[in-house]
Amino acid sequence: SAANALQLPFADNTFDKVMCSEVLEHIPDYQGALKEIERVLKPGGLFCASVPRHWPEKICWFFSEAYHQVEGGHLRIFKAGELKQQIETLGFHAFHQHWAHALHSPFWWLKCIFWKTQNSNWVIKQYHRFLVWDLMDKPVFTRTLEKILNPIMGKSVVLYFRKEAN
């Protein structure tokens, strides 16, 4: 079953850790969702949020209007610094940030360039097979390549916070 991100079915200060991965860009009232996360997280608890990184996402929006107009799709593009500030105003302290999924950026750019034929496009299908292979087998070469490319073109930014103790 699904929960409403603006009314989580949990008591205040329930969790030691909360993770919100690739969700906030889909929620109309993402600030309300962040307030709910703050509410259910214990003082001193850890919060991890990941969202699509600004510039790789901008490229997707540039190549395809349909990409961000699908039902339940991305409603906004976050800038990491601005999102971090918004979360800190809720009583969190940011302590780490990194980028992830660099090998996924070209896949999404291709999908956006060839939006109307993405399901039948040979190049996109092969790239998808490559990503699945990479995720399942975790070869040293692609893991190393992604570590090198993540700071440059990681598809996602991952932010880590600690909720202030009372």
Residues of each region from the PLM?
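A SAM-dependent methyltransferase catalytic signature shared across enzymes that methylate proteins
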Residues: 81-98, 135, 162-163
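Conserved SAM-binding loop
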Residues: 1-60, 80-84, 159-163
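Secondary-structure boundary/capping signal
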Residues: 31, 45, 67, 91-95
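A C-terminal cap/extension of S-adenosyl-L-methionine-dependent methyltransferases
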Residues: 62, 99-166
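A conserved catalytic-core signature of glycosyltransferases
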Residues: 5, 72-73, 78, 154-156
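Acceptor-substrate binding/catalytic loop of class I
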Residues: 65-82, 99-101
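Short, flexible active-site loop motifs that bind/organize anionic cofactors or intermediates
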Residues: 5, 23, 73, 93-96
